[in-house]
Every structure is written in C-alpha cells, then in structure tokens.
C-alpha cells in the first residue's frame, strides 16, 4: 500500500537501484581513469548485495564488465541513474533546506562528474522521492559503501561537522551511536559499517590478496603492498622536521611526532601509565592481564601479540627475508636489519648526557643510562640478584633451572643464552669481526676489542671505593670488590666449596674430574740415560 505523500515507499532493493548505465555517446566521453573507477564501483556494489543475500541472479551489466566488454546500453540514449538507498532520517536531518530531488541530481552529477561534454545528459528515473524504493529493514547502512553518491556536502546535526561524501555523513552518525550491526560469521567480530566488514572478510578468504615478489608476503590491500615494497627498497620519504628521522610511511611519522610534543592522551586505568597511541595502550593492557592468546604450533610457546608470534615463527622456518645490501647478511626482522645498517654507516645518533658516550640504538642508550643511576629493575626471586635488563634476568634464571636451549650444530655444546651461542660459533669460523685500528689485532667480540684498547691508552677508569685501587675494566673491579665483601657466589655442587670468581670454580672442578690443570706440550728432545 502506498504511503502518504513525502514518505518513502518500502520495497525490495535491486542491483538497478545502485547501478548507473551509460549510452554510447556518454561512455565515449569518459577517460580511462573514469571508466576504471566505474567498473570498480559497480563490482563493489554488486559484491555487497551478494554478501547480504539481495542479488539473486547476476545482472547483465556485471557479466559485460567481467568479460571486458564496454558496458554502455544500446537501448538507451541517456544515462539512467536511480538514487542510492536512503532512509527517512536523511530527509529530516541531512536535507532540511533542500528538495530531495535536487539533492539527488547534484550528488549523482558530482559523484561521477561532468566530463565537459555539453551533450552528456543526466536524467533521474524517479521523479519524486516517493518512487525511491528501500528495503524495509536491516539494510539502512548499505548506502555507506555505495560510492555512487560522493562529493555532496552534508552537515551532521549533532556536531555540526561538514562532510564531503554522502557515505561519510551517514557513517559519522553511526559512530555517534556506537552501534556495530554488521557481524562477521567467521570470527564474530562486529563493525559499524558494511564496507569495514567487507574489507575484514578478505582476511579470512584471502580474496584479491596481493603478494610481494621480493619476500612472498601476502597482503590484503594493494596500498599495503605498495607500503611494504618500500621496506625492501629502503625508501623513507617521510622525514621528521624536528629530529630529521625518516620513515617509509606517513602514519609512522605521525606517531613519531607525538614523541616530541609528549602528547599522551591514552592512560592505563590499572597503573596510570600514559601513551601517545590507543593501539600501544591496548598492547600495554595485556601486561596486566597476562593474556597470551597467540600460540606457536611448532614449540607451543605463547605470545601477547600476533606480530611477535609471526617474528618467532621465522626461528623455526629459518626464513630471513631482510638482506643487507652492503655485506649480504640476512635478518628475520626488519628492525634487526635497520640496527645492523648503522654498523656500516657508523651512525650513533643517541648520546648520553652524563658521559657523552654515543649509541646507534635508543634501547642501548636507555640500558647504558642505568649504569649511572645504578637502577636494577629486574630481580631474581630465586637468589635475589638484580639486573639492569630483563633479558639478563631471563638468562640468569636458566642457571637455576639448568636449561640450555641454544645448541651449537658444529660441536653440540649448549648454552643458556643466544648471545653466548653466537659468541661461541666464532671459535669455529675463526671470525674476527672487530679489528683494533692501533695494532691491527682482530677480535670475535666488540667488548673484547673495547677491553683491548685500554692496553694502548693505559686508561684505568674503574676505581674501588673501598681501597682506592684502580682497574682497566669493570669486570676486574667487580671481581676485586668481592674481596672486600667476602662474597663467594660460585659454589661447587660436588663438595660445597665456594669461590668469588667463576674461573676459580671451573679450575677447581677439574680436581673432581681428574682432569689435569696444565697439560705439558710434547717435547722432541732426547736425553741420554748414561
């Protein structure tokens, strides 16, 4: 039964309600970009209708587009443009001062644009709003993803905010209400816009996914692929005017800028810590809940975040997609490659204000600062020993558990820390990465080179507060201090004897094993017994 004048007649929604048809003359007026946009929009509108179960049979227009045929309508001499789906609140809230018929004409005309041809006509098939048909309920949000109605300015009555798209105005109103009516059948996640749900579904189906030829990574969006390719090229077009740091994405630069202005609007209700981004706050909250929803199928280790799991999986697969162009070394994480590159450039942008020492990584500077403050935040519950870094505590705890997960493939020796294994491997390769500029001597460890340099400088920077004795190296000072403290942390499990140095314990253990401490070298001299 028809409604009263000015009301919307309810009826089933069809593809023709959201489609535009061209005559041959009109189609020829469009350039390549406009034609491609038209094809893209028609396909997307059709997919949305199919997803909602509205489109039963495939329209002739879609068949033409799929076959690569020109979609102009031979039977028509002018374009037919039916209005998009609308709902009654648009009449009340968004178009208070305009006739709806005029608004439709302007929206369609500006959305697809005049191509400059004076003979290109546009006719609205419905002469009044009463003739527009909308589905009775459930699809009032469909208009948000129908791009046939762009570039019309609307105003939200709540916030008096101006929008340049019909869809933006409606989605803004939806955000105000906070409703999430579109639910994913696969994982149950809800969205306030159908277009967002459509995008989300591609994650499950991998539909229209884009693969990187460089490393094989699959991405859901072409724009993401373009951004990702910048990682391989090392391209960083977005530069911070404040500190000069460059980024490969504008969004990363925007996040970075908040460091300088120290804007931290997102606060944790649990501990009061504030963050510049909501996403960082969300990640931080997991610390309090202890939630680790992402589990590795290979070793069953669990992680707080999906990105951490992805990085972890590369340990099992041995995948190292990030390669240094300078020396050819491969890395399983892009961040590790970025850190590594600074070795070649010699760049050390992070300087300690206390002693002037410079570092190539901010994390190293933060770690270094704790030497001056004496802060040791990470304490072992087993023996009470405190550490500057959490990684040091993790490695230390393996002393108590006896766990040695890092094994050398060359000789089978196992270690409790990854760094210890890396150092050990250099024994087999005889790799001396770090060379002394003074005498040319090579070392497998940078710390050993640093210690060695003291021989040339004669510098003794480490002084004992107890007796005033000065030492070249902090390790020597630490060992010396145990004399005053009478501390003997290294205990023999065999007889219980304790030592203040691990080297002394190692030497002592050979007494129990019967191993000779010093093995004489083979002597070729012959002696006469007479």
From Swiss-Prot:
Tell me where the cross-link Glycyl lysine isopeptide (Lys-Gly) (interchain with G-Cter in SUMO2) is found: 264
Zinc finger (C2H2-type) in chain: 182-204, 210-232, 238-260, 266-288, 294-316, 322-344, 350-372, 378-400, 406-428, 434-456, 462-484, 490-512
Keywords (alphabetical) are:
DNA-binding, Isopeptide bond, Metal-binding, Nucleus, Repeat, Transcription, Transcription regulation, Ubl conjugation, Zinc, Zinc-finger
GO cellular component term of the entry, any? nucleus
Q: Which residues form the KRAB domain?
A: 13-84
* Pfam families for this protein: KRAB, zf-C2H2, zf-C2H2_6, zf-H2C2_2
Name any one GO molecular function: RNA polymerase II cis-regulatory region sequence-specific DNA binding
Answer whether the UniProt record assigns the keyword Lipoprotein to this protein: no
Q: Which SUPFAM superfamilies has this protein been placed in? A: beta-beta-alpha zinc fingers, KRAB domain (Kruppel-associated box)
Task: For this entry, list what GO says about its biological process.
Answer: regulation of DNA-templated transcription
* Localization per record: Nucleus
> Keyword Translocase: yes or no?
no
Family the entry assigns: Belongs to the krueppel C2H2-type zinc-finger protein family.
Role: May be involved in transcriptional regulation.
List the PANTHER family: ZINC FINGER PROTEIN (PTHR24381), ZINC FINGER PROTEIN 273 (PTHR24381:SF355)
Would you tell me the protein name for this molecule? Zinc finger protein 680
Tell me what gene encodes this: ZNF680
């Amino acid at each position: 039964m028809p409604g009263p004048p000015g009301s919307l007649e309810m009826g089933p929604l069809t593809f023709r309600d959201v489609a535009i048809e061209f005559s041959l003359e009109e189609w020829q007026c469009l350039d390549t970009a406009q034609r491609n946009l038209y094809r893209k929009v028609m396909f997307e509108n059709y997919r949305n209708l199919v997803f909602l179960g509205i489109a039963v049979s495939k329209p002739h227009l879609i068949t033409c587009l799929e076959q690569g045929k020109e979609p102009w309508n031979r039977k028509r001499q002018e374009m037919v443009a039916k209005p998009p789906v609308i709902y009654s609140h648009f009449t009340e809230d968004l178009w208070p001062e305009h006739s709806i018929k005029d608004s439709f004409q302007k929206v369609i005309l500006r959305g697809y644009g005049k191509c400059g041809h004076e003979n290109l006509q546009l006719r609205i098939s419905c002469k009044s709003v009463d003739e527009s048909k909308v589905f009775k309920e459930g699809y009032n949000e469909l208009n948000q993803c129908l791009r046939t109605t762009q570039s019309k300015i609307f105003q939200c009555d709540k916030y008096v905010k101006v929008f340049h798209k019909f869809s933006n105005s409606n989605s803004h109103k939806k955000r105000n209400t906070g409703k999430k009516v579109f639910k994913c059948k696969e994982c149950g996640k809800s969205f306030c816009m159908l277009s967002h749900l459509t995008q989300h579904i591609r994650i499950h189906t991998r539909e229209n996914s884009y693969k990187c030829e460089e490393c094989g990574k699959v991405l859901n969006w072409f724009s993401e692929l373009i951004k990702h390719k910048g990682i391989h090229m090392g391209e960083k077009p977005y530069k911070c005017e404040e500190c000069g740091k460059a980024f490969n994405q504008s969004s990363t630069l925007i996040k970075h800028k908040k460091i300088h202005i120290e804007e931290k609007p997102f606060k944790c209700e649990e501990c009061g810590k504030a963050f510049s981004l909501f996403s960082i706050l969300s990640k931080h909250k997991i610390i309090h809940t202890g939630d680790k929803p992402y589990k590795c199928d290979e070793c069953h280790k669990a992680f707080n975040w999906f990105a951490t799991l992805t990085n972890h999986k590369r340990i099992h697969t041995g995948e190292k997609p990030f390669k240094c162009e300078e020396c050819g070394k491969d890395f399983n994480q892009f961040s590790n490659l970025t850190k590594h590159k600074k070795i070649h450039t010699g760049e050390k942008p992070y300087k300690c204000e206390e002693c002037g020492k410079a570092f190539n990584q901010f994390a190293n500077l933060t770690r270094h600062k704790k030497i001056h403050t004496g802060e040791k935040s990470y304490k072992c519950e087993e023996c009470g020993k405190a550490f500057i870094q959490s990684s040091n505590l993790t490695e230390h705890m393996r002393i108590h558990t006896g766990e040695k997960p890092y094994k050398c493939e060359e000789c089978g020796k196992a270690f409790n820390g990854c760094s210890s294994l890396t150092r050990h491997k250099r024994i087999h390769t005889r790799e001396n990465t770090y060379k002394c500029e003074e005498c040319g001597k090579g070392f497998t460890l940078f710390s050993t080179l640093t210690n060695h340099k003291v021989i040339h400088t004669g510098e003794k920077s480490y002084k004992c507060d107890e007796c005033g004795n000065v030492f070249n190296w902090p390790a020597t000072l630490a060992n010396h201090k145990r004399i005053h403290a009478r501390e003997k942390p290294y205990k023999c499990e065999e007889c219980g004897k304790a030592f203040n140095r691990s080297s002394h314990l190692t030497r002592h253990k050979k007494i129990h094993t019967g191993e000779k401490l010093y093995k004489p070298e083979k002597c070729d001299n012959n002696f006469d017994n007479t």
